[in-house]
Regions:
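Positively charged n-region of N-terminal signal peptides that target proteins for export
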Residues: 1-6
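Bacterial N-terminal signal peptides
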Residues: 7-17
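Catalytic cores of peptidoglycan-degrading enzymes
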Residues: 148-275
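Intrinsically disordered, low-complexity acidic/polar segments
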Residues: 49, 60, 78-80, 102, ...
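Surface-exposed, glycine-biased beta-strand/turn segments
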Residues: 26, 92-203
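Short, charged, solvent-exposed linker or helix-capping segments at domain edges/interfaces
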Residues: 53, 103-106, 267-268
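Cationic-aromatic interfacial patches
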Residues: 22-99
Length: 275
């Protein structure tokens, strides 16, 4: 029996050592599916390397003696092999598959499903503002990658859900919805800078916070905004209050997280991701 037990114990020790050596960031954030995050090891370097995915710069952080790229994977990404570029070299990584459920919503305001021509002009202007914010890339290192919940409350709608409004399919749900009362304070989940404040056709009152290197939080449908563009925020500071402005059926807190201009599942950053 001891002779049989020794190899088994050695194998267990090897597996435990391998797990322990895995990066904490990798273990926590690496969810490489459409709408998820890939953590790619860039190796050691004297200073922070730069990397790009789909031509866009990605967040790079150091952990122990190596640099890691934290790559946002868009919902439109096909499963298979994707490629990160770092200077002249390319780094492949695998993207798995994930099936997202459907959600059917009935809206009384038909214009919020099929906007009128004047609405469409407004929507186009507002979209251009928001795209510019999502593509912001400041040099700062995020204060924390494991984020705080902006509010305490149950989830009412998950990320990636295929949405049908009055029977017509529209864009997938690009964030998390929390079922909390109107007026609930919304707190920034990490240090950041307010880069955009607006009152939009679909999103209602909205705030974008840049946490550094394309790591962006967006909060919308707010009843009140308590910050201004350019304001620097510390983790836990209030950005505004929960509401139901824009295309909303009732009060809730909607939170988007974006990496390299890809909307990704905020649940990954609060330990609530479900494969």
């Amino acid at each position: 029996m001891p002779r049989l037990l020794a190899p088994l114990l050695a194998l267990c020790a090897l597996l435990l050592a391998t797990t322990a050596q895995a990066s904490y960031i990798t273990r926590t954030l690496n969810k490489p599916v459409p709408g998820g995050v890939a953590v790619v090891d860039l190796g050691p370097a004297a200073s922070a390397p730069s990397a790009r995915f789909d031509g866009k710069p990605v967040l790079v952080v150091k952990e122990q003696d190596t640099w890691l790229a934290i790559v946002g994977i868009p919902l439109t990404q096909k499963p298979g092999t994707a490629t990160l570029s770092q200077g002249t070299r390319t780094l492949p990584f695998s993207v798995g598959s994930k099936k997202y459920p459907e959600q059917h919503i009935t809206l009384k305001n038909k214009r919020q499903v099929n906007p009128e021509p004047d609405d469409l002009k407004r929507i186009d202007r507002e979209l251009a503002e928001q795209v510019k914010a999502y593509r912001s890339f400041s040099p700062g290192v995020p204060s924390n990658l494991i984020l705080d919940k902006p509010v305490n409350g149950p989830l009412s709608s998950k990320f990636g859900v295929r949405r049908f409004f009055n029977g017509e399919e529209r864009n997938p749900h690009a964030g998390l919805d929390f079922a909390v009362p109107a007026g609930t304070p919304i707190k920034t989940p990490a240090n950041g800078k307010v880069i955009l404040v607006g009152d939009y056709f679909f999103n209602g009152r909205t705030v974008f916070v840049d946490h550094g290197q394309g790591f962006i939080s967006m909060f919308c449908h707010m009843s009140k905004v308590d910050v201004r563009p350019g304001q620097v925020l510390r983790r836990g500071e209030v950005v505004g209050k929960v509401g139901s402005t824009g295309r909303a059926t009732g009060p809730h807190m909607h939170w988007n997280v974006s990496l390299n201009d890809a909307r990704v599942d905020p649940a990954i950053f609060i330990g609530a991701f479900q494969p």
